[in-house]
Amino acid sequence: MNTKSQFEIQDIMKILPHRYPMILIDRITEITEGVGLTAIKNVTINEPYFAGHFPAQPVMPAVLILESMAQAGAFLVLNTVPDPLQKNMVFSSISDSKFRIPIIPGDQVEIKMQLVKIRLGAVKLR
């Protein structure tokens, strides 16, 4: 259990197992333990996926936007449990996702996650 309200990338990497190039959150700017958080993903032209998606008009793939949301949610949950390095989280489903605006190099994505419920070891986030 952590009492900090903001986390930099070094702190995030102590909780999440993801590493470059798949760590897709850069900072936690606000967290209320067991309730919700706000995370930031800074998108730069140096992201490896921009080489092929799409070379002339780079756009962050939707599946990686979802992954950044999953990582923020995992951080929210793992930050509240004792000994988070001994826990495994698995993303199992998503519903009602819509992408209205493309994310391009130079954008800063704000990810807000809210804990809805925990039941029988399953976590529902919004």
Which residues are covered by each model-predicted region?
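A residue-level detector for short acidic-glycine micro-motifs
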Residues: 27-30, 96, 101, 115-117
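Catalytic strand-loop segment that frames the active site of acyl-thioester-processing enzymes
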Residues: 19-60
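Short aromatic-glycine motifs in intrinsically disordered, low-complexity regions
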Residues: 7-19, 86
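Hydrophobic residues on conserved beta-strands that form the core of alpha/beta folds
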Residues: 25, 91-94, 124
